């Protein structure tokens, strides 16, 4: 029996401020858009706001009182006890290990060997809205917790563990959820699941949004329509090929997400890591941004020689996104294409891998892009979301965006035009290897 307990700790010194959700709305181009502003002490997005600032004005905890902090409450993960569907539409609840053992008895090949469902990798950053914490668990359960008492207010379980092991290098882990409100009482929580669904529930009850998605379940299948992807396919380690592990982002009225696509494939053919957008109210598919081209007339297809775009994959956003409601842009930091360290099957620069892309949130069209590595062979994925900042350079005010990288550089651009704020020197890589 493996009892896994995740603990969330808060402190008695911290005061949790909240204001009515309607007060968080600000007017943007074309209508009222939520801003995820942290000025009222709340934390409405993974990074505080959709611009990725990660700044809170709360000042109740500082160097003078840090040593006085005490544990106010502890929270035990709801992943310790889960449920499974039974014949006839029933539901059976039991400890996690009991449920998993039963699933394996029914289908011995359900999970990747050595990677049975586990709740031990709690990586989510909670949101805090109106005195309630919202987050998801390693098993893709959505949770609301009273920030004052630690009481679990609701749980929504999409039961992703019933389908198999989530994609390799990211098995059974989740990083957070997204919050949206129309400012008039409709408040929703969104998150992706390890088996590739986008979930929408009511923030106050945790009940699925019946108007989101095609069947009243409050979920849409993010695998549908992606090339070279079938929900029943597994990789050579018996893991799923596609999941959503990082939190989506809501920009204007679009809920947008990247994906976790299985790394280090041993086959030439792989799933492209497209970025997908859905209507925040209905779940209707809005657009896809093709990080790997899907036709011979798309922008960037000339960077995939020998028509290698027809079978290459990944170039996914496995990390987080950033957005600008006023401009109507969402910013995509992409990763490496397949295979990470071997590029013989994909000659060319391989756009849009390892690229920062500004996309029009209404249309899904590219506004500008910067590719940090051409024909990547070193796994130089952009490892996190960019940061939207306003700077003054030589007396000129600039709406800027900065992106940290595995290369050790911080790239800085005008986020409207994509022009570098400071010159970027590009150097060729020596291709002589002295190998026969």
Task: Indicate residue ranges for each PLM-predicted region.
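Extracytoplasmic beta-rich repeat domains
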Residues: 75-125, 155-183, 211-247, 290-320, ...
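Phosphate/diphosphate-binding loops
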Residues: 385-434
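Boundary at the C-terminal end of the N-terminal hydrophobic targeting segment
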Residues: 22-24
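Bacterial N-terminal signal peptides
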Residues: 5-17
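Repeat-blade elements of multi-bladed beta-propeller folds
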Residues: 43-47, 118-141, 168-197, 238-267, ...
